[in-house]
Structures are given as C-alpha cells and as structure tokens.
C-alpha cells in the first residue's frame, strides 16, 4: 500500500470501534470486493453530501489480488452507485501525485485533475502532494457506466 494516506490499525478492537462508529453514518458507504468468498478489497464512498450532491471515492485492493481487474470493476460499480442510486452530481478523489498508475486509471475513467494540494498528507517521514480529481455525472452516464439505463 505505497500510497495509502493513513496509518494501519493497531488492533481488532480499533477496527470494531471504527465499525460501530460508522455503521449508521449516512455520509458513508462501504462495499467489500470479493472473489468467491474471499475479500480482496474495499471501495468506499465518503463525505456523501446530499445537499451539494458530492462524495469522495476511494478503493483499496489487496496487493496479492492486484492486476486482476478487481479495482477497475469495483471502481466503476461504485461510481454507478454514486450517480445512479445516490443521485450525486460529482464524485471526487485524492491521489498522490507520484502514483502515476492510479492517476492514469482515474483519467481513463474521465476523472480530471482539478488541482494540487501541496504537502497535504504525511507518510513515511515526508509530506506529500496530492491531486484532487473529479468526475461530473454528465461525463459518466452513457459513456463509461456498467449499468445501462
């Protein structure tokens, strides 16, 4: 997880507390990415704002399952959910500017770089810059959606 912005959790109780805190939070949706009965990752919609109709998306795939198409499919399904179920107008994300592979993937899904946040997060002993990337609903539906309406 070279480009993850947060420190790992230290214990199961820490994760249980996080789960309890967030299970009823209407501003978040989490989806487990599975291969059969094995969890291979998670995709999340965060900071869901029903007034401005915006939300943040993030995805994590276990490195041992990388390059198998899980991220691509889960990412597109999460975007479909945001636009077609939650009726969001915009989905945005933050990505380390050095994570060129991720930036390329997001751009291939019509996300545009909207700006750079200087020294926005601290990891591995240094401050890192990140891009804010966004996608408007009108640029997603009828172009890249897995769900055809």
Residues covered by each model-derived region:
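Acetyl-CoA-dependent GNAT
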Residues: 7-66, 136-140
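Glycine-rich acetyl-CoA-binding "A-motif" of GNAT/NAT acetyltransferases
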Residues: 38-41, 101, 127
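Active-site acidic-Proline motif in GNAT/NAT acetyltransferases
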Residues: 62-64, 68, 84, 97-98
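Conserved acetyl-CoA-binding loop-helix of GNAT-fold acetyltransferases
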Residues: 67-81, 103-108
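Short glycine/proline-centered loop/turn elements that form peptide/ligand docking sites
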Residues: 71, 75, 98-102, 119-124
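Conserved GNAT acetyl-CoA-binding A-motif
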Residues: 84-94
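Conserved catalytic-core motifs of GNAT/GCN5-like acyltransferases
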Residues: 92-95, 112-129
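Conserved small/polar residues in nucleotide/adenosyl-binding loops
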Residues: 147-149
